[in-house]
């Protein structure tokens, strides 16, 4: 997905800003947060965040929920490079693994699970993990307590 922020600001300007932020705020990472195009979820009031390095993905999702005033019964999904990051992962870890060449981490959010699955490596092979509980296979469960 194309970032509106990238479209509006030239690479050199974004890179210089991210470098300045990294030098000035050692305990924070620069994040651009944007809504997935055509998502039925509210637009966020600001896109640029300086996120503490010890914040988890789940805590950042909470920040997004509050900023868009999303009720707790509504689902929200965030994506980094078209994957769903683990909620327990630190933003600093996600930043190191997925930051853009310009120095920003680009996070997209949506009310739908746009990409459908989360990938996980097992024995060097990518395995698909269903995200929606309706995709789970419970046929191996015969009786309670078994």
UniProtKB/Swiss-Prot annotation:
GO CC aspect terms: autophagosome membrane; cytoplasmic vesicle
Main location, first listed in the record: membrane
Matches recorded under InterPro entries: Atg8-like, Ubiquitin-like_domsf
Keyword flag Transit peptide: no
Superkingdom of source: Eukaryota
Primary role: Ubiquitin-like modifier involved in autophagosome formation. With ATG4, mediates the delivery of the autophagosomes to the vacuole via the microtubule cytoskeleton. Required for selective autophagic degradation of the nucleus (nucleophagy) as well as for mitophagy which contributes to regulate mitochondrial quantity and quality by eliminating the mitochondria to a basal level to fulfill cellular energy requirements and preventing excess ROS production. Participates also in membrane fusion events that take place in the early secretory pathway.
Family membership: Belongs to the ATG8 family.
Protein's name according to its UniProt entry: Autophagy-related protein 8
